[in-house]
Amino acid sequence: MIGYLEGKILYRQGERIMILAGGVGYEVLLPSVVSASMTKGPGDETGLYIYFHQTEKQPKPVLIGFNSLEEREFFERFISVEAIGPIKAVSALCIPIGEIAAAIENKDSGALRKLKGIGARTADKIIATLRGKMAVFAGEHGGEPAGPAPVEENFHLLVLDVLVNQLGHKAAEAKELINQAIKRNPAISSPEELFDEVYRGETG
């Protein structure tokens, strides 16, 4: 299963992008909010975290791209709501995920109905299913558009990816381990130092 793609952009058309990686062109769907934050175009190098979707009813693999693990985790929770599949969710995520998360936590059905394809009944289902589970996204993003991570945060995301996808931590748990490590040692400046501090905290 594909979790991350990095390579050269062959083309962008609407909310579809094709990335050349390892000699293979991968077509990726981008939620509107992700597409709007991407400034790169054909010929540029880019990297996306991938949600891979394939079922008996949908045998053709669908790749959905995100700027960060946090965006992908939000998406995975969002599609846990009955009647919201991955393709519908791609269309619905047309505003920053922080704003959507805040609307869910504040039981703001009206704000959710502004999402493409989301009516009153579905908005109520979203709130009933996800309220109490999305505060971390509202707090982190604060309603601001998602964008490229600052340079100093790039290695944080690398460590987060390894903790979640290779070592089996849940995303929220891994994020907390990283935050605590940085609090203990604010001078951390590399992935190696961050890994050392994370596991020093776990064993200490």
Swiss-Prot record:
<dbReference type="GO" id="GO:0048476">
    <property type="term" value="C:Holliday junction resolvase complex"/>
</dbReference>
<comment type="function">
    <text>The RuvA-RuvB-RuvC complex processes Holliday junction (HJ) DNA during genetic recombination and DNA repair, while the RuvA-RuvB complex plays an important role in the rescue of blocked DNA replication forks via replication fork reversal (RFR). RuvA specifically binds to HJ cruciform DNA, conferring on it an open structure. The RuvB hexamer acts as an ATP-dependent pump, pulling dsDNA into and through the RuvAB complex. HJ branch migration allows RuvC to scan DNA until it finds its consensus sequence, where it cleaves and resolves the cruciform DNA.</text>
</comment>
<keyword id="KW-0234">DNA repair</keyword>
<feature type="region of interest" description="Flexible linker">
    <location>
        <begin position="146"/>
        <end position="156"/>
    </location>
</feature>
<dbReference type="GO" id="GO:0000400">
    <property type="term" value="F:four-way junction DNA binding"/>
</dbReference>
<dbReference type="GO" id="GO:0009378">
    <property type="term" value="F:four-way junction helicase activity"/>
</dbReference>
<dbReference type="InterPro" id="IPR010994">
    <property type="entry name" value="RuvA_2-like"/>
</dbReference>
<keyword id="KW-0227">DNA damage</keyword>
<dbReference type="GO" id="GO:0005524">
    <property type="term" value="F:ATP binding"/>
</dbReference>
<keyword id="KW-0963">Cytoplasm</keyword>
<feature type="region of interest" description="Domain I">
    <location>
        <begin position="1"/>
        <end position="67"/>
    </location>
</feature>
<feature type="region of interest" description="Domain III">
    <location>
        <begin position="156"/>
        <end position="204"/>
    </location>
</feature>
<dbReference type="InterPro" id="IPR013849">
    <property type="entry name" value="DNA_helicase_Holl-junc_RuvA_I"/>
</dbReference>
<comment type="subunit">
    <text>Homotetramer. Forms an RuvA(8)-RuvB(12)-Holliday junction (HJ) complex. HJ DNA is sandwiched between 2 RuvA tetramers; dsDNA enters through RuvA and exits via RuvB. An RuvB hexamer assembles on each DNA strand where it exits the tetramer. Each RuvB hexamer is contacted by two RuvA subunits (via domain III) on 2 adjacent RuvB subunits; this complex drives branch migration. In the full resolvosome a probable DNA-RuvA(4)-RuvB(12)-RuvC(2) complex forms which resolves the HJ.</text>
</comment>
<dbReference type="InterPro" id="IPR000085">
    <property type="entry name" value="RuvA"/>
</dbReference>
<comment type="similarity">
    <text>Belongs to the RuvA family.</text>
</comment>
<keyword id="KW-0233">DNA recombination</keyword>
<feature type="region of interest" description="Domain II">
    <location>
        <begin position="68"/>
        <end position="145"/>
    </location>
</feature>
<keyword id="KW-0238">DNA-binding</keyword>
<protein>
    <recommendedName>
        <fullName>Holliday junction branch migration complex subunit RuvA</fullName>
    </recommendedName>
</protein>
<dbReference type="Pfam" id="PF01330">
    <property type="entry name" value="RuvA_N"/>
</dbReference>
<dbReference type="InterPro" id="IPR012340">
    <property type="entry name" value="NA-bd_OB-fold"/>
</dbReference>
<dbReference type="GO" id="GO:0005737">
    <property type="term" value="C:cytoplasm"/>
</dbReference>
<dbReference type="GO" id="GO:0006310">
    <property type="term" value="P:DNA recombination"/>
</dbReference>
<dbReference type="GO" id="GO:0006281">
    <property type="term" value="P:DNA repair"/>
</dbReference>
<dbReference type="Pfam" id="PF14520">
    <property type="entry name" value="HHH_5"/>
</dbReference>
